């Protein structure tokens, strides 16, 4: 269970903390998962810094599980770097800290990277005891220096190295396994040739294969959606005489048996809904899903249905959105507002900035009316 994320000096962020721990509200208990709230939403005007937070998560996913030859450090806040000057090392360092629990252990993981393409400091604490520390190329594991060997990239986290070498260390491997189950969907980049879904556990699964693998389950979920066509994805087995341009996957609608369309003709709305549900269903219970601008993929009514599936699946979800309709289903401790001011972004929890808010209050109406006085620059 992810408990807290703290990000410092990454992209537009000065410092930002997202706390998943529930407050003492006595309503909407369906949004409570153990001692945390789920999902958690981030709102804010364009340019408020919401995307910076998700790009930090993306950077973590890449560092922990992707091709070592393509790793890059967290991009630091350019305003801070320019103000401090290139000689100030701290201004060139970005970091992320995570508190989480898994398999009965409480962890604190800290990872920083620098513009010099190295890791100034990384550490993993388990149950208040230091398991390892990686600082300026020197790795201390269980209190002893750990040999890294030659030709090890300075940007490969120590956690990644140790989890692959010390496979019998269940405490360490459990921490790495938990963080490796993070998945990020960068919806503003959904038309990018480089892809927009990031998850080391899903590997190189193609869009078609992902849709096909969860087609039956998605179809049953869609039965609960209002006015949504029911369909399934079928995989076409190629024959020796098949044309090279024959579609590999087909779209089949319920009630129109015997007829199908190439998957390429599937509408963007249908594809986005199916992809989000297929990805969610592919994640293990207890995994974490991060989605930037969820409303780019889902209709307002579909977002609420999607959040219902998130609750039932028991996957933690952190998302940003401009669709305020979802606010009607969230508690004050589930909502954060991003704010950009003088070059720095931060996030503010509604239950902190407006502690007297109650169930009777209309959060959506208050937000649209600028009652909270929180938001970024347009």
Region locations from a protein language model:
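C-terminal lobe/lid and adjacent interdomain/linker elements of RecA-like ASCE P-loop ATPase modules
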Residues: 1-4, 304-378
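Pre-Walker A-like glycine/lysine-rich segment at the N-terminus of P-loop NTPase domains
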Residues: 1-62
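Catalytic P-loop NTPase motifs of RecA-like helicase/translocase cores
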Residues: 13, 297-298, 326-327
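Conserved P-loop NTP-binding catalytic core
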Residues: 35, 39-41, 54-108, 114-116
């Amino acid at each position: 269970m992810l408990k807290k994320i703290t990000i410092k000096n990454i992209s537009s962020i000065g410092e930002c903390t997202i706390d998943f721990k529930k407050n003492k509200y006595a309503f909407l208990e369906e949004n409570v998962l153990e001692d945390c709230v789920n999902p958690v939403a981030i709102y804010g005007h364009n340019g408020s810094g919401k995307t910076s937070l998700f790009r930090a998560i993306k950077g973590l996913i890449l560092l922990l599980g992707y091709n070592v030859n393509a790793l890059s450090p967290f991009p630091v806040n350019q305003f801070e770097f320019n103000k401090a000057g290139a000689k100030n090392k701290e201004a060139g360092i970005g970091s992320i800290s995570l508190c989480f629990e898994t398999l009965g252990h409480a962890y604190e993981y800290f990872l920083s990277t620098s513009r010099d393409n190295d890791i100034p400091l990384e550490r993993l604490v388990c149950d208040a005891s230091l398991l390892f520390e990686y600082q300026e190329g020197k790795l201390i594991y269980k209190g002893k220096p750990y040999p890294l060997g030659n030709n090890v990239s300075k940007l490969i986290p120590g956690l990644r190295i140790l989890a692959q070498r010390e496979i019998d260390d269940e405490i360490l491997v459990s921490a790495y396994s938990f963080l490796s189950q993070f998945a990020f969907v960068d919806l503003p980049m959904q038309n990018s040739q480089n892809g927009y879904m990031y998850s080391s556990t899903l590997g190189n699964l193609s869009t078609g294969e992902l849709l096909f693998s969860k087609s039956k389950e998605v179809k049953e979920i869609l039965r609960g959606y209002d006015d949504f066509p029911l369909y399934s994805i079928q995989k076409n087995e190629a024959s020796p005489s098949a044309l090279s341009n024959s579609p590999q996957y087909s779209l089949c609608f319920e009630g129109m048996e015997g007829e199908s369309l190439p998957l390429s003709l599937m509408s963007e709305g249908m594809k986005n809904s199916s992809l989000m549900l297929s990805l969610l269903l592919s994640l293990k219970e207890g995994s974490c899903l991060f989605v930037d601008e969820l409303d780019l993929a889902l209709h307002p009514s579909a977002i609420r249905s999607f959040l219902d599936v998130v609750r039932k699946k028991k996957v933690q979800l952190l998302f940003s959105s401009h669709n305020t309709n979802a606010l009607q289903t969230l508690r004050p401790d589930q909502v954060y507002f991003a704010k950009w001011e003088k070059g720095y972004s931060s996030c503010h929890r509604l239950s902190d900035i407006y502690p007297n808010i109650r169930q009777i209050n209309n959060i959506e109406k208050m937000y649209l009316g600028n009652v909270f006085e929180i938001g970024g620059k347009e």
